[in-house]
Regions:
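Active-site rim/loop-helix segments in enzyme catalytic domains that contact anionic ligands
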Residues: 1-124, 281-290
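C-terminal accessory domains and tails appended to enzymatic cores
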Residues: 2-23, 161-174, 186-292
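Histidine-centered active-site/metal-ligand motif
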Residues: 33, 141-145, 211
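Hydrophobic/aromatic ligand-binding patch that stacks against planar heteroaromatic rings
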Residues: 47, 151, 155, 207
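Internal alpha/beta domain cores that form substrate/cofactor-binding pockets in large enzymes
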Residues: 56, 84-184
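Short, solvent-exposed loop/turn segments at secondary-structure junctions
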Residues: 63-64, 102, 135-136, 187-189, ...
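A general structural signal for well-ordered alpha-helical segments in protein cores
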Residues: 80, 148-149, 269
């Protein structure tokens, strides 16, 4: 076996990832819904922003149905406003709204959605592309997450092809290759990188607490399920009755972050599958020359 083959065949192991200085390099985060950022990776987003990374978030849907007791129009307005507040807390530099109706992406052409993502990659020219892990969908019942994951994963490599959407080039955009891909999910498979969010957990919790509309609906769902099973859920019932989501969100976010951290000997953490240089980082390290 050659040395290069040995390098390429090294099995990945999870390691604590220290966020380096961004120097205004771009992280492009593509999510389906407003609450995805805070709940899945709010601590890491806050760490990126604090370290000088420019974080751009693309929200694909308008979350028009994610509420309880509000009209569709009021739901769109409320969720957008709460998303902006949460993003400000985390240090997000820019939000891009694609405005697709929520919970309907299963009927949207994946190729059409991919084109939207390619455009954003070529426009913002990110160092890292961040989205749902298409290979960590076991137990995932949200088709919006699944469709975004698949389209974004393909957009990573098709954004580098000048034959894919030459109309972008005619508009002055250029093909672009992201150096890293960061994948997250409900349960990440083959975790490679763990980010210690002990210093940014408070901001993650505070950002999550901005999503009153969506989390009240979530609490209502929990109460409905519990009732069917013959249970009461006082914390969730209190949210439905009062609209105060903070006690529930503080408990849930702190507990989940601590559980992830405990698995890696940390106080609080978030897990990712990170792919560098298209999965050929060993090749790059063996034959490449780093620029000064």
């Amino acid at each position: 076996m050659t040395e290069l083959t040995q390098v390429l065949q090294l099995q990945s192991m999870s390691a604590t990832h220290v966020i380096e200085s961004g120097n205004q390099r771009v992280v492009l985060l593509i999510v389906a819904h407003a609450d995805d950022v805070a709940l899945f990776l709010g601590g890491t987003v806050a760490a990126w922003a604090a370290s000088g990374w420019r974080v751009v978030v693309v929200r694909v849907t308008d979350d028009r149905w994610d509420s309880v007791g509000l009209s569709e129009a009021d739901t769109i307005i409320a969720n957008a406003a709460e998303f902006r507040r949460a993003a400000d807390i985390l240090g997000v530099a820019e939000i891009v709204e694609l405005g697709y109706p929520t919970d309907t992406l299963a009927d949207v052409s994946e190729v059409a959605l991919r084109e939207q993502f390619i455009r954003q990659i070529r426009l913002h020219r990110p160092y890292a592309l961040v989205t749902f892990d298409p290979y960590a969908m076991y137990g995932e019942d949200n088709q919006d997450h699944i469709k975004v994951a698949a389209a974004a994963d393909e957009a990573f490599w098709t954004s580098q092809f000048d034959k894919h959407h030459p109309e972008h080039l005619a508009e002055g955009l250029k093909v672009h290759g992201c150096f890293e891909r960061w994948y997250f999910g409900r349960k990440v498979v083959d975790v490679t990188d763990v980010v210690d969010i002990s210093d940014t957990l408070d901001r993650k919790i505070e950002a999550a607490c901005q999503h009153t509309t969506m989390m009240t609906n979530f609490a209502n769902q929990l109460c409905l399920q519990a009732s069917t099973g013959g249970w009461d859920l006082p914390l969730a019932a209190s949210v439905v009755a009062t609209g105060d989501i903070r006690p529930m969100m503080e408990a849930l976010v702190a507990a989940s972050s601590a559980a992830t951290g405990a698995a890696h000997g940390l106080g609080a953490a978030e897990e990712f599958r990170v792919v560098t240089f298209g999965g050929l980082a060993g090749y790059l390290e063996h034959l490449g020359v780093r620029r000064p």
